[in-house]
Amino acid sequence: MAANNNSDPILDEGGGGGVKHEAVGEAGEGKGGGGGAAATQAPAAMLPRSGSRPQLDLSGAAIHGNLEDRNPTILLPNQSDDISHLALDIGGSLIKLVYFSRHAEHSSEDKRKLSTKRRLGMLNGGRRSYPVLGGRLHFVKFETGKLNECLDFISSKQLHRGGVDSPSWRSGAQPDNIVIKATGGGAFKYADLFKERLGVSLEKEDEMDCLVAGANFLLKSIRHEAFTHMDGQKEYVQIDQNDLFPFLLVNVGSGVSIIKVDGHGKFQRVSGTNVGGGTYWGLGRLMTKCKSFDELLELSQRGDNSTIDMLVGDIYGGLDYSKIGLSASTIASSFGKTISDDKELSDYRPEDISLSLLRMISYNIGQISYLNALRYGLKRIFFGGFFIRGHAYTMDTISFAVNFWSKGEAKAMFLRHEGFLGALGAFMSYEKHGLDDLRIHHLVERFPMGAPYVGGKIHGPPLGDLNEKISWMEKFVQKGTQITAPVPVGFPVTTGMGGFERPTAKGDILRSDASAALNVGVLHLVPTLDVFPLLEDPKMYEPNTIDLDLNEYKYWFKILSDHLPDLVDKAVASEGGTDDAKRRGDAFAHAFSAHLARLMEEPAAYGKFGLANLLELREECLREFQFVDAYVSIKQRENEASLAVLPDLLMELDSMNEEARLLALIEGVLAANIFDWGSRACVDLYHKGTIIEIYRMSRKKMQRPWRIDDFDMFKKRMLADKKGQPYKRALLFVDNSGADVVLGMIPLARELLRNGTEVVLVANSLPALNDVTANELPGIVAEAAKHCGILRKAAEAGGLIFDAMAGIQDDLKDEPVSVPLMVVENGCGSPCIDFRQVSSELAAAAKDADLLILEGMGRSLHTNLNARFKCDTLKLAMVKNQRLAEKLFNGNIYDCICKFEPVP
């Protein structure tokens, strides 16, 4: 048995973990239990959600502190101070915790941001007040047998008192009568112990109520939550929120409960069966002498059920029964072959018995579930419960049964967070955090490293601060042990990491469950994120241009791995090259390599992952190890070099007529986009010349027609009405620092301003590679404005410059008062952009925009090449990757894209 015998709780900085299970527990406590009796009963009455839950008292509510704080605290003077941030699901084998932590960072608004918000109409009564604090939802599991460790964890973080960052904890107040929501049989069994150790009372929540509430929340709020599992392949399913209900929720515990869910808080238990996980474990224990559920599943990984089950081929001489559509490998009778065999129980391999038993029970659960779905006209069936636990073969078997009996009309679906349904439902029963008001775009899931995960086992205690995390990683590296993945979710210790072949009647091969298990991250609640309002069809929008199949994964993993040493060097240098920085740099390299190894092992581990997600994962990993901006010194140097030659460029542009100038500007944007530290080919160029030499070389190579060349169409639109303004407001999504923004996008912005178009420069909220950020742009614009009256007046009008720059001479000082030039952040810290989650400032700026310009590979090629918007859109990029050029355009590296998409 390859289970993890470590008794420590596992957490992913509050994220999911895996532990060894010695008891089933949950099922016998109501969730999925008692199935047999219910199977013959009439459907239960509709169960309403409890009305006794405490409500949020909003009387006298006011924003506390800075009125313009990014994530404002709402002061509730009449609210009692017993707000809890913790809920539990206490089963027989596992305790599941869901807890909330506030964001530590609270950014203050400077004068520029306030000016921009005021101009965008975000301060004049249009401001939303958020009933939920910006923060994180964490998911943690403990063995129920190690309950004291769970209590120690709660106490150390003061979760029962709102956490160590809560006002009540900081004030030293000792609130009386603290109540924590809990579900599961252990909520009754261990109530006295919680009172004794923590001084809290457990308020018991109905288990089925919590299951349904948890499932509804996940399906509503997590984009890649539900997935199908057929032939060992996971496929995430995007569910239309308007078409979610009704569905069937099948909870497989010791027995099986089948629940028809009609809406939020509206459900009924319509059926069940007494043949469930307890049946599998009980019969399996009798026949194989296995001591635990996980050991029994371990055996099934190496089983061959054809030695025990009677197959259709056994009856028909190895042939299919094609007349009724049965293949030779179909099971005709579970355990049927043992009838004619002159063998005793001891003559059969325990592995084969376990697999045959697993198939028998899983097939029947799938069939009964589909028959209930058919009865109520439902096509969507979600399965959960301890019996599922991310076990690849169990999911495959249930999926096969549903597909077979429905003739392909229905699909079995599973949930990535399925082990936390009850705890989530209990957490939501507080109705104090506004979770019911959250939408899918408010939640961002991230995957920090937890404990080192090696050889299918999690080693070591929960990782606390960063130093402890690094120390643990160094320990494994010193031993020469490869850290192969961050902490996975659910039940990764069911088997080892050997990738056992699993012979079946069909000869199928599935991975061991340690590699097939999915991961649960930390859910970041960001109520200031919005859907970009100019998306033509938000429901159909897919940011990633290329799906990452196995070959694509291998290619990009090699690219990222090869780039890693250089990135570490720059990250360490950005922190002064100190010993501490070197230590963190090494830890980052090991952590990100572990992420790559995990995704190579199971591409679906973190949900549906495209290249944009992969690139953002790298940036998040850098931030996890406290590297704020790895390219900061490089960006500063390139900005200074580019600003030095900007006056000459502007003078050259001003000597041209309007048509020639527009072409030169677009050529300049494309040429300057060559400066990308994320491209290996471009990095090699940096070693062969200065930034200006490379820029001039790139300009000389600008020969039309480009690979995609819609310039003439764009020119016609720009010059169509010389007397009026062709566009009211343009949003320019900028890319790299240095020449890219200074010699490319700023001159283009200047031309739009000259024509009377408001310009909003949109940049990253957080650093990513050498991309310019929204915090850096005002300083760059201010320097550029010293040499240009158009830029200076527009920057003053847009609040980017507040002090008059008297004494600065230029040839354009008599230009008329300009329309504003503004800067907003996009809400992300990635080289790409997902328009399903952008900052509220960007969403507000988009209201009056009628032109979008997406610049750079990340924002217009890797993502959004095929995206359609409600206004005219220009996509500009130089292709700096040969494989991408071939795959997208049958082109070559350094090809240019000028794609104009006007609205009808």
UniProtKB/Swiss-Prot annotation:
Q: Which residues bind Mn(2+)?
A: 735-736, 771
Write out the ranges of the annotated region (4'-phosphopantetheine phosphatase).
Answer: 473-904
Name the residue ranges of motif: Subfamily II EGMGR motif.
855-859
Pathway assignment: Cofactor biosynthesis; coenzyme A biosynthesis; CoA from (R)-pantothenate: step 1/5
Q: Which SUPFAM superfamilies match?
A: Actin-like ATPase domain, AF1104-like
Q: Which GO terms describe its cellular component?
A: cytosol; nucleus
Record-linked NCBIfam families: panK_eukar
Function summary = Catalyzes the phosphorylation of pantothenate the first step in CoA biosynthesis. May play a role in the physiological regulation of the intracellular CoA concentration. Functionally redudant with PANK1. The phosphatase activity shows preference for normal or oxidatively damaged intermediates of 4'-phosphopantetheine, which provides strong indirect evidence that the phosphatase activity pre-empts damage in the CoA pathway. Hydrolyzing excess 4'-phosphopantetheine could constitute a directed overflow mechanism to prevent its oxidation to the S-sulfonate, sulfonate, or other forms.
This protein is called Pantothenate kinase 2
